[in-house]
Amino acid sequence: MDRYYYEYTVDIDAFKDEIESFLMDRFYNGIEESDGKLILRSEKSLDDIMDELRTYVDSLIKLFDTEIHLKITKEKKENIDWIEKYKKSITPVEVGEFYIHPSWYEPKEGKTNIKIDPALAFGSGHHETTRGCLNAIQKYVQPGMELLDVGCGSGILSIAAAKKGAVVDICDTDALALEESQKNFSLNGVEFREGWVGSAANAKKKYDIVIANIVADVLIMIAKDLQETTKEGGILILSGIIEKYRNKVKNRFDFSILEELQEGEWITMILRNDRGTDGK
């Protein structure tokens, strides 16, 4: 453990859900919320992520022609084992048949248990988008199906699918996510078939189920790739959609909507490829 760590505090007066989701897609060691501010801690510099955040906020200002006030503070602090302190705040969560728990909790009898590296809060099942995807996985994933997890993060969704008997491929634009997913797959005694740094555009085949739990803007940006990677009759699960962006996302996809799961402001959209095309 390093002697010092960096603490970043992100204070923003608008688009808070979007900003939190944006950061969760890029930082896997846990994000704390305190007094309406987001706090990220790391022994390595997160300056690059903060630069990306500033660029993202600038794009929101231009897109919505509005004012957004963003303040980022960075402090170097002595490391008094904040990781252990944070770990103790992580508790198990139950989503349908799945029971997601840190390593110091016992598995739950009668449930599909998923053990997550306790240093990882993102993708622990506590966020509404993760829970929506887990409910969709429980309903639609069958043994032997081929599934692609786009933006795999900590790997919790693809681990859940693998535990249901799916053949799983994973991808993420962040190489760290692939490393963390590998750790969690090993922790759970399951495997993914193939993983790559990149997105759906790099897929070499089509899948029975494609899952993308990412921010709405990115879903819209890669909509064509997500659809082209889904087999005829296949299922596309989209999450990370705030209610006010529902129609914007919906209009970008021409698959039929099977159902929508909503928790709070967050929507998980389940689509089916009824376009009558197959083959790549």
Curated annotation (Swiss-Prot):
Gene Ontology cellular-component annotations: cytoplasm
Keyword Acetylation: no
Reaction catalysed by this enzyme: L-lysyl-[protein] + 3 S-adenosyl-L-methionine = N(6),N(6),N(6)-trimethyl-L-lysyl-[protein] + 3 S-adenosyl-L-homocysteine + 3 H(+)
Enzyme Commission number(s) of this protein: 2.1.1.-
Locations listed in the record: Cytoplasm
Main subcellular location: cytoplasm
A Pfam family assignment: PrmA
Residues binding S-adenosyl-L-methionine, per UniProt: T130, G151, D172, N213
One Gene Ontology biological process: methylation
Keywords, in A-Z order: Cytoplasm, Methyltransferase, S-adenosyl-L-methionine, Transferase
Gene Ontology molecular-function annotations: protein-lysine N-methyltransferase activity
Cross-referenced InterPro entries: Ribosomal_L11_MeTrfase_PrmA (IPR050078), Ribosomal_PrmA_MeTrfase (IPR004498), SAM-dependent_MTases_sf (IPR029063)
Entry-linked HAMAP family: Methyltr_PrmA
Family: Belongs to the methyltransferase superfamily. PrmA family.
Function: Methylates ribosomal protein L11.
Protein name, as recorded: Ribosomal protein L11 methyltransferase
Species assigned in the record: Nitratiruptor sp. (strain SB155-2)
Gene: prmA
